Regions:
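Short, conserved clusters of charged catalytic residues that mark active-site
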Residues: 38-42, 137, 178, 242
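Short, well-ordered beta-to-alpha junction loops that form the rim of enzyme active sites
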Residues: 58-62, 68-69, 114-116, 155-158, ...
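Hydrophobic "anchor" residues on beta-strands that sit immediately upstream
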Residues: 7, 151, 256
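Protease-associated
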Residues: 134-144, 152, 158-159
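Conserved G/P- and acidic residue-centered "switch" motifs that form tight phosphate/ATP-binding loops
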Residues: 11, 155, 303
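Core dinuclear metal-dependent hydrolase active-site scaffold
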Residues: 1-7, 131, 135, 141
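Rhodanese-like catalytic fold shared by cysteine-dependent sulfurtransferases
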Residues: 20-22, 29, 33, 80-117, ...
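Metallo-beta-lactamase
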Residues: 1-105
Length: 347
């Protein structure tokens, strides 16, 4: 009794990181550097003086775009965070803090300001969102809904299943990767109607996770999943996927074009020597870069983002792509020639 036990640190302190100062709803005269300075003051005067035994419960964890490099753990002691969180170094000056916290910030996802608006003005009850979304549609009804509405067909299966066969022009963003962040980054409007193709039994999970980032307009799902679509005899598409070893052979013997869809810091840190950068979150800006004749290779770090990119390119009518299974990690392990490694913190 009377003893501090825990702190709910919100977006101020994360595990291994602190909140992004560029996301705050700020006055017009305040820069992100000003807000970073205010964050420094809050940490130093409100949180760091607390006892080391206190448990920290942050509002976000690994994978969230609200920070740069959060730990995968969900709770920790404040004492441990004081030891290992770069932003809580005891000898850190305010100027050093501002520089480190604002350095390398990627643009915030497009849905962030839309979510802020929803939080201020209110949003639909989730029971209604789920009732509308958890509507099973036969392949015929699903196809009709896709043709008659402006819905995106979103396939949330595993990437290894998607590449083997999918509904033409559907977009892949798998539940087993960074699902919500990529939905938010790639689908511009939170009011966009969505038709789902999900693994059996995970339809409600998909609708729920979409809703958590403001995408409340799922209008149904394909009953029986992709297998039902295929069994009905409807048109299917595939993504040509090859091993890293075969990709290296194509690069070295045929000088095949390579596109790296990782983010810019990842690419600058180390990349396949002949690869061009085409970050997934800016893919539409690079459409003219992809060759119209001859095959080209697409890879990311491990194979998730490259399949997202491939599905987007195919939906835009670009079909001469080949996905590299396992991504940059497999290319490295298979002996691909790469640029010299540069520590990301020095970029």
């Amino acid at each position: 009794q009377g003893k501090d036990h825990a702190i709910f640190s919100g977006d101020t302190l994360f595990l291994g990181d602190v909140g992004r100062p560029d996301l705050a709803q700020k006055a017009a005269h305040m820069t992100q550097e000003d807000l970073a300075g205010t964050l420094f003051d809050s940490l130093r005067t409100k949180i760091m003086p607390l006892a080391d035994h206190i448990t920290v419960y942050p509002a976000h964890g690994a994978g969230s775009a609200c920070g740069k490099n959060m730990m995968k753990e969900t709770v920790d002691s404040l004492g441990n965070q004081k030891k290992m969180n770069y932003a809580l170094r005891a000898d850190m000056t305010k100027e050093e803090f501002i520089k480190e916290v604002t350095d390398g910030l990627m643009p915030p996802p497009k849905y962030f300001p839309l979510n802020v608006k929803m939080n201020k003005e209110g949003y639909e009850d989730f029971d209604k969102v789920l009732e509308r979304g958890i509507k099973p549609l036969s392949p015929e009804a699903f196809e009709a809904a896709a043709n008659e509405t402006e819905a995106i067909v979103l396939d949330v299966r595993h990437q290894s299943d998607f590449v083997k066969g999918f509904v033409p022009r559907s977009i892949f963003i798998g539940l087993d990767g960074s699902f919500a962040p990529w939905v938010g980054a790639l689908i511009a409007d939170v009011k966009q109607p969505i038709l789902l193709i999900a693994p059996q039994g995970r339809e409600e999970e998909a609708i729920t996770r979409l809703s958590r980032v403001g995408f409340d307009h799922t209008i149904g799902y394909l009953e029986g999943g992709f297998d039902a679509w295929k069994a009905s005899g409807k048109e299917v598409d595939q993504i040509h996927s090859i091993s890293a070893a075969e990709a290296i052979e194509r690069i070295e013997q045929n000088n095949q074009a390579v596109f790296d869809v990782r983010n810019t810091p990842e690419y600058l840190s180390e990349h396949v020597l002949s690869a061009e950068t085409a970050p997934l979150d800016a893919l539409n800006d690079h459409l003219s870069s992809f060759p119209s004749e001859g095959d080209f290779l697409v890879h990311c770090a491990g194979g998730y983002r490259s399949v997202i990119a491939s599905s987007i390119l195919k939906s835009r009518g670009i079909h001469n792509l080949i996905d590299v299974a396992g991504g940059f990690k497999s290319l490295q392990e298979s002996g691909a020639k790469t640029s010299d490694y540069v520590c990301p913190s020095t970029l």
